[in-house]
Structures are given as C-alpha cells and as structure tokens.
Curated annotation (Swiss-Prot):
Its main location: cytoplasm. GO terms for molecular function: deoxyribose-phosphate aldolase activity. NCBIfam families: deoC. The gene is deoC. It catalyses: 2-deoxy-D-ribose 5-phosphate = D-glyceraldehyde 3-phosphate + acetaldehyde. This is Deoxyribose-phosphate aldolase. Disulfide bonds: none annotated. GO terms for cellular component: cytoplasm. InterPro entries: Aldolase_TIM, DeoC, DeoC/FbaB/LacD_aldolase, DeoC_typeII. Keywords: Cytoplasm, Lyase, Schiff base. It is found in: Cytoplasm.
C-alpha cells in the first residue's frame, strides 16, 4: 500500500463524518450513517445536529455499527458568551444520547480581551458532559492571531476539554497547518491526553497526510488514534475512497 493510500485509510478511521446544514433532514442523516459504514471500514464518528441523534442511533444500531460514535454541536456556530445557554444545550445533547459534544468557544469575547468567559463556559460544559467527550471549537480561522489561537487552546485545556478543534466549518478560513502546529504544540506542553480535530478544508489524502505529519512530528507516531485525533469533514470521505480505488472520483464541491 502506498503512503497516500495508508494516509487515506487512516483518515477514514479518524473521521467525524459531518452534516451540519440548515436543510438537514432525517433522511439525510440516515444516508450519512450509511456512508459512515465504508468499504474501508467505519468512520470514527458522525457529527450532526442534536435533534437528529435519535434517528442516527436507530440507524447505526440497524447497521450493526454501534462502534461509530455520535457527535453533536452546541453553542454553534457563533460561539456566544452566554454560559447558561451553552450549558443547557450541552445537557440537552447528552440527554439526546450524544457520545461526544463539540462546543464552540466564545472566541469573539477572547478577541475583545475577555479570557474568563471562555474558561468558565468550557468548564461548565465539561461538567454537564460528565463522561461524554467534550471537543472545544476555537474557530482558529477567525482568531487568526497565533497568540489568540494559543490562548484559546490553553484555556480550553485548562478548563477540561477532551479535544481542541480548529473550526466550525461555517467561516471562510477553517483548518490550516499553521493553526494545527500551534494547537498541537499546546497539547504537547499542557496535556498529551487531549485530542486534536482539524475541521473543514481538508479535501484529500495528501492534505490529510500533512495534518497527520504535523501531529506525529510534535507528539509522536504512537499518539495518533481515534481517541486523540479526528478529521471533521463531509466531502473528504469520497476523495479518500477514490484514493483507495473504492469509489469514483468525487465531484468538486464547496462542502465542509
């Protein structure tokens, strides 16, 4: 197997296959669950809006794919600074049966100089999650400044995040190698049990390999696993399956 095919295989096993569109329906989520069961193995998770968790759970059970985790989003996509609402949304997501919650850090508050609200919001949402995995989306493409990307990562980890994630996929700049370098370096300094999720903008096996390479250089080859590394993506899967000669070439899309 070529290096590119190896990267494609790994990226599928590390993928949060995502649909977070305003026009999502039960049927689209059912279709997503079927796509997550690929000829190259199951994706690590699917990521959907909270209201679709019950139908996703039913579908995955019917497919015998109980190993696929169900992730959802809260405080999404704008990263508001109302802690009470973020906590209520997170509690509701857990009650729906989410295995993982991706919460948006109040990044605009941080840009305005308020570090406290981000820390407190993540801390409260982690308490609401209990054993459910909490991924914190820092929206690195909007923060832009390396100092802010680093600080959002530090605050999230200090507050109890299980993962730090680059992006919502709802802004012009999503996952970049530069942001990955900063975020993975913070993980190496503060807590190597914390995971990293580049989301949006990873289009093919070659790009996936670049992100995996940064993680391995900073944290070691043994660090990367579904417990510590995920790709958030929708259009990436077809490209990876094409690389593995298991699907036709994907049509060019503007997808996440």
């Amino acid at each position: 197997m070529t290096d590119l095919k190896k990267a494609a295989q790994r990226a599928i096993e590390l993928m949060d296959l995502t649909t977070l569109n305003d026009d999502d329906t039960d049927q689209k989520v059912i279709d997503l669950c079927h796509k997550a069961v690929t000829p190259a193995g199951n994706t690590a998770a699917i990521c959907i809006y909270p209201r679709f968790i019950p139908i996703a759970r039913k579908t995955l059970d019917e497919l015998g794919a109980e190993d696929i985790q169900i992730a959802t989003v809260t405080n999404f996509p704008h990263g508001n600074d109302d802690i009470a609402i973020a906590v209520l949304e997170t509690r509701a997501a857990v009650a729906y049966g989410a295995d993982e919650v991706d919460v948006v850090f109040p990044y605009r508050a941080l840009m305005e100089g308020n570090e406290t609200v981000g820390y407190e919001l993540v801390k409260a949402c982690k308490e609401a999650c209990g054993e459910v995995l909490l991924k914190v989306i820092i929206e690195s493409g909007v923060l832009a400044d390396p100092v802010l990307i680093r600080r959002a990562s530090e605050l999230s980890i200090e507050a109890g995040a299980d993962f730090i994630k680059t992006s919502t996929g709802k802004v012009p700049v999503n996952a970049t190698l530069e942001a990955a370098e900063i975020m993975l370096t913070v993980i190496s300094e503060k807590n190597t049990k914390v995971g990293f999720k580049p989301a949006g903008g990873v289009r093919d096996a070659a790009q996936a390999a670049e992100f995996l390479g940064v993680a391995e250089r900073i944290l070691g080859a043994d660090w990367v696993s579904p417990r510590t590394f995920r790709f958030g993506a929708s259009s990436l899967l077809n490209s990876l399956l094409h690389t593995l000669e298991l699907a036709d070439a994907p049509k060019r899309t503007q997808g996440y």
